[in-house]
Amino acid sequence: MKRIVIDPDICNGQPVIEGTRITARTILEFLAAGDTVEDVLEEYPSLSKEDVLECLRFSAELMKNHYRLQDLV
């Protein structure tokens, strides 16, 4: 992931978009709530469409791991 970075000194080590303190989680929550990519870009004008798409790719990559659903809820 080129645009997503994890640094223990930034946002407690949460994945963020490089050069910002905007977490991937924040972007994903906007999209999950029904906001469009364009809505996110209006809210965070410093981001690019590629930044938002990278958050989706990052999430998809995490989902490739196998989890027992009982352990997550």
Residue ranges of predicted features:
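Short, Lys/Arg-enriched N-terminal segment that forms or immediately precedes the first helix
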Residues: M1-V16
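Exposed, low-complexity/repetitive linear segments and helix-based recognition motifs
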Residues: I4-I6, T26, D51, R68
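N-proximal short alpha-helices
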Residues: I10-G13, R25-E29, R57
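Amphipathic, hydrophobic secondary-structure cores in small proteins
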Residues: T23-L53
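C-terminal structural segments of small proteins and small subunits
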Residues: S46-V73
